[in-house]
């Protein structure tokens, strides 16, 4: 094991190199990071495991990185020991905000490209972000050990993109470790050292934070100027709070306590604060004894793209859901939430997410880490609605949609960049046209791959657009998108009525052309999920007061003639009339309870394949209650 000589707090800036690894999802960032940890010797061989820096169970199971991880790595080059600050970043489009925060803590970026796949949409997106942050770019082809790798072809693609020679593109294998030592040498040569002022008052940028059940908030910082000591009071310049640090240290690869952190170093600080409002990502940390006067430029707050309601199945868990979201917010700065009430689902929160994967991950973490059983409403985007009387409404939830005549509805748009093999151009064009996309430009990035630019309503992308894109291109296409203003659209609110009563959880804002198909789909789904009652239940879809689709759940019928053996027909008729009158009265007074399982199944965006299983569960639950 290599002994690390550069001690935190006393490391000269000239030997520090802070860099991050950026790439499209599944191009091998975490595997290359594993080899770097192995080569540097900071992780003993017996403790090494795949995806070492992916600490969450979800990350290990799904094979994706969700949280950026910062690690201090020693590396000797030409007899001098250097200190590398490495940040492994996520690759999925939903976690672009994580990547942008990591870039602000670095001077260089390793742009990793899969030698079997070539440049993909998120490769370009991350590259442009790194260029915006003025970082030194080191292009690298990974997975060169695979038989299907085409390093020469893809090296030319990369060279054409960033303006270097194909021979400048490094070739590595995260699996075998080939070329990784050369990559570390290249990082030392190409990435500039930090240029903070070690003698100035301490200034550190908070670029992340996590919640520890025992020690409270763990704040990750990048020191820009000066020095912070473990016995020195610290001051948060943005929120104006002062703390006594319990511990200061670096991550190498586990938390390692140190006496101090100096300019250019990346580390952590624990103040013992348990209140989530006491640590804000993007804030500047300084010494309370010798404070800085000017804070560092922070981050632009992320803007949620998708909204959905989260409701506890057991309403008594509402306070626990609030605490869980507060703690998760520390670890996930892009999550926003406000309390909301639903007639059907009770108390819950309206949550804003960066995309569907982000929404899925938050839901899963709430379930695993905090033991909560939740119902999630269908995802939707925000709309700006102008009513006939001129009143303005910002709608994040279909229940906020104003009644009466609507003058104008404005919906958010995205600029979508799709990279696909040329044989699928027609299929991609059809898909985008079906989703109200407007084509921009199209350019060939190599002889057989095309980058297509579309302007598409965000609402069309947040449901199943990506799945359909993968399906129509046999998995070869990749998608990246970002905000691109707004435009007016012909949208309507579709309400679902059960027994004549609106169920707010099933309401949706859809394009007028798709309103009928949504109404038919939901009424059919609910007909198969809601148990039969003693009276007939109508399920209707409506736009305002106009019914556009209807399904009926037929009544259960008791055989009232079973005890009549022959005899007078008038006796039988009397019993049937009595039953008919009873059912009529029951229909007027009867209240339909929609089971929780039916809500969960109806609000899932998948097909109806599991409806029969859900129905069986509902019946079993009812028998148990009976």
UniProtKB/Swiss-Prot annotation:
EC number per UniProt: 3.6.5.n1
Region (Disordered): 603-626
Transmembrane parts of this sequence: none
Keyword terms: Cell membrane, GTP-binding, Hydrolase, Membrane, Nucleotide-binding, Protein biosynthesis
Family annotation (Pfam families): EFG_C (PF00679), GTP_EFTU (PF00009), GTP_EFTU_D2 (PF03144), LepA_C (PF06421)
Compartment(s) of residence: Cell membrane
Gene Ontology BP terms: positive regulation of translation
Reactions performed catalytically: GTP + H2O = GDP + phosphate + H(+)
EC class of the enzyme, as a word: hydrolase
Membrane topology: Peripheral membrane protein
UniProt-listed InterPro entries: EF-4, EFG_III/V, EFG_V-like, EFTu-like_2, G_TR_CS, LepA_C_sf, LepA_CTD, LepA_IV
Record-linked PROSITE patterns: G_TR_1, G_TR_2
The keyword 4Fe-4S belongs to this UniProt entry's keyword annotation: no
Gene Ontology cellular component terms for the protein in this record: plasma membrane
Superkingdom of source: Bacteria
Domain tr-type G: 14-195
Function of the protein: Required for accurate and efficient protein synthesis under certain stress conditions. May act as a fidelity factor of the translation reaction, by catalyzing a one-codon backward translocation of tRNAs on improperly translocated ribosomes. Back-translocation proceeds from a post-translocation (POST) complex to a pre-translocation (PRE) complex, thus giving elongation factor G a second chance to translocate the tRNAs correctly. Binds to ribosomes in a GTP-dependent manner.
Name of the featured protein: Elongation factor 4
Source species of the chain: Bifidobacterium longum subsp. infantis (strain ATCC 15697 / DSM 20088 / JCM 1222 / NCTC 11817 / S12)
Gene giving rise to this polypeptide: lepA
């Amino acid at each position: 094991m290599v002994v690390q000589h550069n001690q935190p707090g006393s490391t000269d800036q000239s030997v520090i190199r802070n860099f991050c690894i950026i790439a499209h999802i599944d191009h091998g960032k975490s595997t290359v990071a594993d080899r770097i940890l192995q080569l540097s010797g900071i992780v003993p061989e017996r403790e090494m495991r795949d995806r070492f820096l992916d600490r969450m169970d979800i990350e290990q199971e799904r094979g994706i990185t969700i949280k950026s991880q910062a690690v201090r790595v020693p590396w000797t080059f030409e007899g001098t020991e250097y200190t590398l600050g490495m940040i492994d970043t996520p690759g999925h489009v939903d976690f672009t905000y994580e990547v942008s925060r990591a870039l602000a803590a670095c001077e260089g970026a390793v742009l990793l490209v899969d030698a079997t796949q070539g440049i993909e949409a998120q490769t370009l997106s991350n590259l442009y972000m790194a260029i915006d942050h003025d970082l030194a770019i080191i292009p690298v082809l990974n997975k060169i050990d695979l038989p299907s790798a085409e390093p020469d072809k893809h090296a030319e693609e990369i060279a054409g993109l960033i303006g270097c020679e194909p021979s400048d593109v490094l070739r590595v294998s995260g699996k075998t470790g080939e070329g990784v030592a050369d990559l570390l040498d290249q990082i030392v040569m190409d990435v500039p050292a930090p240029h903070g002022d070690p003698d100035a008052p301490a200034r550190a940028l908070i670029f992340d934070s996590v919640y520890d059940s025992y020690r409270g908030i763990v704040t990750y910082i990048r020191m820009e100027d000066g020095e912070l000591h473990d016995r020195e009071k610290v001051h948060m310049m943005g929120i104006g709070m002062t703390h006594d640090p319990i511990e200061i240290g670096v991550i190498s690869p586990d938390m390692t306590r140190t006496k101090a952190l100096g300019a250019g170093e990346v580390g952590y600080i624990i103040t013992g604060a348990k209140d989530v409002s006491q640590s804000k990502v993007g804030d500047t940390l300084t010494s309370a004894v010798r404070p800085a006067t000017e804070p560092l430029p922070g981050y632009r707050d992320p803007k949620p793209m998708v909204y959905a309601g989260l409701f506890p199945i057991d309403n008594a868990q509402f306070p626990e859901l609030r605490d869980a979201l507060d703690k998760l917010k520390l670890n996930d700065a892009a999550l926003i939430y406000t309390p909301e009430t639903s007639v059907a689902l009770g108390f819950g929160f309206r949550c804003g997410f960066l995309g569907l994967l982000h929404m899925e991950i938050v839901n899963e973490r709430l379930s695993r880490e905090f033991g909560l059983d939740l119902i999630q409403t269908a995802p939707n985007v925000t709309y700006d609605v102008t009513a006939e009387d001129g009143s303005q409404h910002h709608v994040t939830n279909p229940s906020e949609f104003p009644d009466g005549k609507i003058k104008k509805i404005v919906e958010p748009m995205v600029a979508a960049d799709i990279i696909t093999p040329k044989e699928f151009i027609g299929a991609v064009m059809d898909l985008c046209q079906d989703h109200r996309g407007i084509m921009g430009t199209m350019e060939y990035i190599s002889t057989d791959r095309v980058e297509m630019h579309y302007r598409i309503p965000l609402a069309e992308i947040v449901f199943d657009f990506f799945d359909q894109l993968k399906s129509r291109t046999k998995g070869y296409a990749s998608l990246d998108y970002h905000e691109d203003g707004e435009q007016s659209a012909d949208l309507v609110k579709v309400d679902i009525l059960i027994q004549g009563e609106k169920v707010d959880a099933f309401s949706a804002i859809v394009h007028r052309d798709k309103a009928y198909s949504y109404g038919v789909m939901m009424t059919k789904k609910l007909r198969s999920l809601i148990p039969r009652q003693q009276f007939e239940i109508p399920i209707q879809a409506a736009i305002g007061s106009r019914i556009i689709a209807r399904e009926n759940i037929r009544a259960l019928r008791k055989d009232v003639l079973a005890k009549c053996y022959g005899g007078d027909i008038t006796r039988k008729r009397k019993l049937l009339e009595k039953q008919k009158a009873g059912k009529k009265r029951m229909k007027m007074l009867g209240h339909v309870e929609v089971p929780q399982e039916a809500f969960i199944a109806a609000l899932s965006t998948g097909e109806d394949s599991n409806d029969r299983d859900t129905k069986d569960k509902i019946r079993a639950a009812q028998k148990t209650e009976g």
